[in-house]
Amino acid sequence: LYMGTATDNGATAMLNLVESLKYSWVPSTFSGQGAATPYDSNLVK
């Protein structure tokens, strides 16, 4: 396990968040983000 500086940890957390958003198929997982459909969480196109 690599223990970096606070900056490194922040960057890693950010990358993990980006990966989560990229592979999230549930619109409500992140408000307004990560949806794999043209609809938002209110089902408005």
Swiss-Prot record:
It is found in: Secreted, Extracellular space. The keyword Hydrolase applies. Keywords: Carbohydrate metabolism, Cellulose degradation, Glycosidase, Hydrolase, Polysaccharide degradation, Secreted, Xylan degradation. Its EC number is 3.2.1.4, 3.2.1.8. It catalyses: Endohydrolysis of (1->4)-beta-D-xylosidic linkages in xylans; Endohydrolysis of (1->4)-beta-D-glucosidic linkages in cellulose, lichenin and cereal beta-D-glucans. The keyword Nucleus does not apply. One of its GO terms (biological process) is cellulose catabolic process. GO terms for molecular function: cellulase activity; endo-1,4-beta-xylanase activity. Its main location: secreted. One of its GO terms (cellular component) is extracellular region. It is an enzyme of class 3 (hydrolase). It comes from the Eukaryota. Pathway: Glycan degradation; xylan degradation. Has xylanase, avicelase and cellobiohydrolase activity. Belongs to the glycosyl hydrolase 10 (cellulase F) family. This is Endo-1,4-beta-xylanase Xyn10A. It comes from Gloeophyllum trabeum (Brown rot fungus).
